[in-house]
Amino acid sequence: MSEKPEDTEIFEAIVAAAIEAGKVVHDIYRGGFDVQRKADASPVTDADNAAEAVILKRLREVAPHIPIIAEEEVAAGRVPAIADEFFLVDPLDGTKEFIQKRGDFTVNIALIRDRSPVLGVVYAPAKSSLFAGNVSTRTAFRSDENTDSSQTAPRRTIKVRPVPADGLIAVSSRSHSTPETDAYLAQCNVSDRVSIGSSLKFCLVATGEADLYPRLGPTMEWDTAAGHAVLVAAGGSVYAPGGVPLLYAKPTFRNSYFIASGTLIPPALSGRG
């Protein structure tokens, strides 16, 4: 997948946008917020809307020609036409974790090109941890960006780890575990299982802290695109049923089931999910 000349500028812009939006989210997290319900009964807070406004503004400044598919915009019925290239934005992934005052929620921003993520940033403001990946250059990094500081933290390269001989570490959803996930993991040589919210599951695999993340439950494209990009840039893969790559720009933006992994080639999923 070839890199475009403007990708470096866009990459740095989405890193900055994620940090700025994360500061907004964190300020609201430490203060107070209202919780409402969307048409699909999922929760939404002041932080979702405020962070999305920041991200939309920044992306339109750096790349006004690229459409943006953002979770709260879609919920409000504002869905632009897309072509080969568009942004996917989840301003607050892990809203349930946010509401319950657990720290594993993230800001997710990704650039999709030809149905695959090419740039992605996942920022966890409560943990001061940022993960970013450029798939075209196969480079991914982690930095500990403090939302209370204007200083930029050092960037440390991240890579998936080799398959361990003593068993896999699997990561799964804190809020959305399913019997199907349990059955799938029973096929694998899993020695430990970690539960965490949001796109941090992708990031644990990308940093070599875990080996496998099966998601046998519903997700939307904005939930996964940024973490997907980080993982692939770090040397991992994300498989849809049949062992094919998970693709984007689907008509409803709803994902199939998928398996994210490091160097492991996992057992294939059957069916569409």
Regions found by a protein language model. Name each.
Residues 83-125:
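Glycine-rich active-site/cofactor-binding loop and its immediate structural neighborhood
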Residues 51, 107, 201-202, 227:
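Short, hydrophobic alpha-helical packing/hinge segments within bilobed ligand-binding/sensory domains
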Residues 25, 48, 59, 95, ...:
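Residue-level signal for inorganic ion chemistry
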Residues 109-203, 246, 252-273:
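Acidic beta-strand-loop-alpha-helix segment within the catalytic core
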Residues 1-92, 113, 179, 183-186, ...:
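N-terminal subdomain of lithium-sensitive/metallo-dependent phosphomonoesterases centered on the IMPase/IPPase/PAP
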Residues 1-16, 22, 183-187, 202-273:
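Oxyanion/phosphate-interacting regions
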